[in-house]
């Protein structure tokens, strides 16, 4: 992969920085693994906005990605690496020895023609998926289950990875990129390596329209609103918040803890912001 600056033929092109990957498949995706994706523009079944700043954007299909990796003991060959508009990471199309095809999150360094395998006996190689109990301490992993058999939930975005720190009894300790250390059952599965497309965070879209293509609408500052619309609103001329920064509903916006799940608090060994 390489970062490419675009020739500044216009103001909208001047700031563009693209991530170019010549190994990406240039054709259509694998049709049997596509599903229709309905765009709701952040509205619920009543038509009310439940998530702001969503709407528009280019139409696309959902790619069904295999997050469970439960097809054990059968070698799969990587047919190609594809772009996925639904996530920051790229996806790899696997063809198993019995002819079945599945998409997985493409790890860093995985290329077409490589072989991967799932199961407890799988070797420690990038792209292989196996239970955490069989992975050596100190290994970098991604696509980690939080409950056995539920499917990967942790470290799925571009460039993400988790360090396996230790195993104590039935649980393993993982250090996330945020600095959080949490426990996960050793029967949960994880994939060896880190997620590919790690240069995704270095790209620059260059213009507002490119953000709109992705279904993201503009964000209006609270201080630019009227008092009826936001706690920061109102005032004569340009003014600041005049108070602790809050959301439109009055929740403190900076540093306020909003986690409220006591049932799983004991799984977090060290919070991400603790010193």
Swiss-Prot record:
GO terms for biological process: cytoplasmic translation. Residues 229-241 have a biased composition (Basic and acidic residues). It comes from the Bacteria. One of the primary rRNA binding proteins. Required for association of the 30S and 50S subunits to form the 70S ribosome, for tRNA binding and peptide bond formation. It has been suggested to have peptidyltransferase activity; this is somewhat controversial. Makes several contacts with the 16S rRNA in the 70S ribosome. Belongs to the universal ribosomal protein uL2 family. Part of the 50S ribosomal subunit. Forms a bridge to the 30S subunit in the 70S ribosome. This is Large ribosomal subunit protein uL2. It comes from Laribacter hongkongensis (strain HLHK9). The gene is rplB.
């Amino acid at each position: 992969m390489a970062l490419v600056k675009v020739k500044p033929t216009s103001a909208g092109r001047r700031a563009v920085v693209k991530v170019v990957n010549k190994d990406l498949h240039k054709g259509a995706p694998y049709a049997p693994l596509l599903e229709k994706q309905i765009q709701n523009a952040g509205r619920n079944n009543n038509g009310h906005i439940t998530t702001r700043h969503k709407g528009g954007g280019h139409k696309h299909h959902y790619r069904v990605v295999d997050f469970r990796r439960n097809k054990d003991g059968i070698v799969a060959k990587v047919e190609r690496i594809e772009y996925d508009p639904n996530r920051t990471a790229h996806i790899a199309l696997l063809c198993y020895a019995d002819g079945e095809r599945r998409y997985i999150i493409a790890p860093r360094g995985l290329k077409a023609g490589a072989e991967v395998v799932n199961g407890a006996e799988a070797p420690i190689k990038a792209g292989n998926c196996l239970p955490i109990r069989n992975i050596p301490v100190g290994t970098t992993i991604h696509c980690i289950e939080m409950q056995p058999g539920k499917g990967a939930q942790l470290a799925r975005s571009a460039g993400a990875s988790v360090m396996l720190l230790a195993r104590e009894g039935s649980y393993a300790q993982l250090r996330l990129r945020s600095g959080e250390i949490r426990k996960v059952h050793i029967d949960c599965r994880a994939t060896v390596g880190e997620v590919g497309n790690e240069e995704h965070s270095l790209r620059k879209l260059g213009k507002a329209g490119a953000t709109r293509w992705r279904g993201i609408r503009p964000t209006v500052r609270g201080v630019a609103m009227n008092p009826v619309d936001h706690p920061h609103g109102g005032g004569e001329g340009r003014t600041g918040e005049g108070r602790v920064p809050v959301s439109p509903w009055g929740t403190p916006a900076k540093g306020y803890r909003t986690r409220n799940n006591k049932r799983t608090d004991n799984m977090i060994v060290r919070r991400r912001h603790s010193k």
